[in-house]
């Protein structure tokens, strides 16, 4: 069953595909470094890493507000992901034009498969990963992981843990990495000593849960939190990836710039209007039906929007890849060794693994139109409620 929401956005509960049918083509950006004539692309697909939630608000806002239409696209599909969907594989197989995925996950895929993909915009400038334990359980820093049950979702999300451990000379064999689901139940049920969480999702989930000892919601003071952003294992996360070989095609390169312009406008709107952006994303999650991300309550989505903005807007231009942060991510990926003694990567990635050429062109054109493309985010106050409703 399909449910319609604003501007023709649709989300299928099984296929979970968001689509926007737009009108006539607008002006296009020129391909960086090419003046060759070409027929502009007007139809594209974007593969997300996860289900509809404010982690991806900028893309849903761009759909809702017509920003893709403004950049000359007739049809845009935003395809939500899930635990069994690997965005970089979808992109490499030609089933999407662009994909959103964490940098270390893609680096591992590139080395293992020989695929060639390029990070053309680094949406998240900071790591949002946490390791959360109950206060007093003795897990206050990465060095405390030794001998503990450390929860992780797997699916490539665990490598930041191993990178942080490697920086502390902590052997993975001395830590029990325990698979947890995409909730905080493993911590609440005592199955792990510290659970993996994102600042914008699972951390809110546990603060939306009632403490059985008090009858009130848990508070931050009930927990010790290790933020990977504050460790040497911090890695770059949500990035927009393109097909490296196709970037030699002037039509695809041009579409990449126009796509990034629309996405940038979406994220700028989400920064300046977090409440409305959260509502737009909530509508998309509701339209996804039972396949929607858990939990999809409006208060939870507003919390998520607030926290995601903190990861994106670090003061520089939107989406620009910081060379030092990239180098730190690569260093962590090279050092990370899992509990089975396997490395994430053994060699430095190719130079083509990232490029600022396309995002810088997009920002330049937006600035020429009078749009401010950099800045910091001023957080709003969000009061969590039970279940995020």
What is the predicted function of each stretch?
Residues 182-185, 192-289:
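Pocket-lining segment of extracytoplasmic ligand-binding domains
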Residues 250-341:
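Secondary-structure end/capping motifs
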Residues 32-180, 185-189, 193-197, 226-228:
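Short, glycine-/small- and polar/acidic-enriched structural segments
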Residues 1-42, 363-389:
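Short, low-complexity disordered leader/linker segments with a strong preference
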Residues 67-71, 168-171, 211-218, 288-292, ...:
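Short helix-capping segments at alpha-helix termini
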Residues 327-389:
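Conserved C-terminal helix/tail region of periplasmic/extracytoplasmic solute-binding proteins
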Residues 78, 119, 177, 270-281, ...:
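Surface-exposed patches in mature extracellular/periplasmic domains of secreted proteins
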Residues 70-72, 142, 218-233, 249, ...:
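Short, solvent-exposed loop/beta-turn-alpha elements that line the ligand-binding surface or hinge
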């Amino acid at each position: 069953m399909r449910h319609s929401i604003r501007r023709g956005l649709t989300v299928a509960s099984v296929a979970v595909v968001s689509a926007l049918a737009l009108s006539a083509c607008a002006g296009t950006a020129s391909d960086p470094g090419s003046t060759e004539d070409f027929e502009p692309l007007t139809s594209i697909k974007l593969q997300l890493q996860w289900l509809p939630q404010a982690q991806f608000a900028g893309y849903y806002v761009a759909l809702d507000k017509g920003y893709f239409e403004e950049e000359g696209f007739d049809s845009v599909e935003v395809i939500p992901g899930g635990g069994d969907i690997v965005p970089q594989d979808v992109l490499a197989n030609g089933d999407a034009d662009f994909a959103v995925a964490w940098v270390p996950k893609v680096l591992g895929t590139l080395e293992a498969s020989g695929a060639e993909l390029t990070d053309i915009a680094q949406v998240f400038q900071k790591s949002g990963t946490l390791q959360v334990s109950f206060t007093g359980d003795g897990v206050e820093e990465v060095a405390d992981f030794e001998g503990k049950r450390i929860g992780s979702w797997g699916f490539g999300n665990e490598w930041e843990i191993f990178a942080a451990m490697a920086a502390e000379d902590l052997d993975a064999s001395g830590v029990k990495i325990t698979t947890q689901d995409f909730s905080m139940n493993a911590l609440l049920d005592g199955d792990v000593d510290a659970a993996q969480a994102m600042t914008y999702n699972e951390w809110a989930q546990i603060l939306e849960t009632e403490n059985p000892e008090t009858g009130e919601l848990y508070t931050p003071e009930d927990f010790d939190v290790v933020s990977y952003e504050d460790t040497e294992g911090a890695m770059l996360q949500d990035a927009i990836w393109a097909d490296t070989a196709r970037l030699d095609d002037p039509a695809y390169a041009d579409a990449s710039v126009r796509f990034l312009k629309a996405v940038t406008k979406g994220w700028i709107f989400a920064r300046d209007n977090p409440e409305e952006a959260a509502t737009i994303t909530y509508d998309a999650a509701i339209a996804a039906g039972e396949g929607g991300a858990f939990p999809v309550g409006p208060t939870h989505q507003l919390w998520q929007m607030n926290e995601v903005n903190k990861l994106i807007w670090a003061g520089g231009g939107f989406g620009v890849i910081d060379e030092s942060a990239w180098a730190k991510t690569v260093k962590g990926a090279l050092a990370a060794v899992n509990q089975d003694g396997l490395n994430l990567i053994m060699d430095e990635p190719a130079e083509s693994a990232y490029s600022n050429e396309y995002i810088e062109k997009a920002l330049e054109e937006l600035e020429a139109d009078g749009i401010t493309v950099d800045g910091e985010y001023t957080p709003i106050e969000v009061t969590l409620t039970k279940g995020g409703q």
